């Protein structure tokens, strides 16, 4: 019989893509004769409109699986993720839980700091670690920080981030520069980097003064796409980003803000850069991040200027 794996991504964002969606699709592609995979972001049957539980839900996918694999905290909430683990154990399943952020130590200044404290999400994550059979994280220091919360009879392993360079977006031609002595700086970021950008906001003005704004350009990628509802909280994030970013610019415009790409098109953003930027505040949360930016920028042979953490 094939090994049956139920994959429960937290959402469809970049973290879920790199940590569960892409690797498990690759596993199925390479070993489809040995594994069978089902996908279900809502295996507990919560009503997605009002958050109520369906009383007659049969948990068919969970009962079918040998392994229940989930990651981070579901868009349905931390308690929902914990219940996935609890139900899987109730049905006698092997539970694999993956995280790519240090959710047990959110730093002050992180956009979700108050939410994590008010909803007890750090403690919920510790509970999930303790009740999972296999916990995977992205790097060694991360593993050392969460080891105290894991069950000593379970397995804690480092599974590094990787990129499928066979995807078309990682095999595109670079966008030509307008002239030879011209440098395009690029920043690609999600929606939790307000504190990190503060460490960078003065840099563009300094560089523009030294080399001349006509000889360089600054591109910021990740703005919510045009079809995002106007009341979506991501717009508020990028309004704050914009305020922070533009503090570093005086005079003529040599910057632009670009829409986010879906994870399977990330590579396209790096075709427009000559130097990639990844400023981070030094703290345990950021020091637990992976080297994924090296893999992204490196594919297009772009130097990466980053904080020495992680």
Locations of regions flagged by a protein language model:
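Membrane-proximal helix-turn-helix segments that form the acceptor-binding/catalytic region
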Residues: 53-57, 63, 83-91, 115-135
């Amino acid at each position: 019989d094939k090994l049956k794996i139920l994959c429960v991504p937290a959402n469809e964002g970049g973290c879920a893509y790199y940590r569960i969606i892409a690797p498990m699709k690759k596993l199925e592609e390479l070993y489809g004769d040995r594994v069978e995979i089902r996908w279900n972001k809502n295996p507990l049957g919560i009503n997605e409109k009002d958050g109520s539980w369906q009383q007659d839900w049969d948990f068919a996918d969970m009962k079918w699986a040998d392994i229940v694999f989930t990651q981070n905290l579901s868009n349905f909430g931390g308690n929902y993720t914990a219940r996935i683990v609890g139900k899987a154990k109730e049905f006698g399943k092997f539970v694999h839980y993956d995280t790519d952020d240090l959710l047990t130590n959110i730093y002050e200044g992180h956009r979700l700091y108050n939410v994590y404290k008010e909803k007890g999400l750090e403690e919920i994550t510790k509970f999930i670690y303790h009740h999972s059979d296999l916990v995977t994280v992205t790097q060694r220091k991360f593993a050392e920080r969460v080891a105290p919360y894991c069950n000593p009879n379970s397995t804690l392993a480092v599974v590094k981030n990787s990129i499928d360079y066979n995807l078309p977006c990682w095999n595109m031609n670079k966008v030509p520069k307008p002239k030879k002595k011209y440098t395009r700086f690029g920043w690609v970021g999600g929606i939790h980097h307000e504190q990190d950008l503060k460490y960078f906001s003065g840099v563009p003005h300094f560089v523009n003064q030294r080399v001349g704004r006509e000889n360089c350009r600054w591109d910021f990628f990740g703005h919510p796409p045009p079809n995002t509802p106007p009341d979506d909280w991501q717009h508020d994030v990028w309004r704050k980003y914009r305020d922070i970013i533009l503090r570093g610019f005086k005079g003529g415009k040599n910057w632009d803000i670009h829409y986010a790409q879906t994870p399977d098109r990330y590579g396209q953003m790096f075709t427009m850069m000559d130097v990639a930027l990844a400023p981070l505040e030094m703290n345990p949360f950021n020091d637990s991040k992976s080297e994924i930016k090296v893999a992204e920028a490196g594919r297009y042979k772009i130097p990466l200027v980053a904080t020495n953490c992680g």
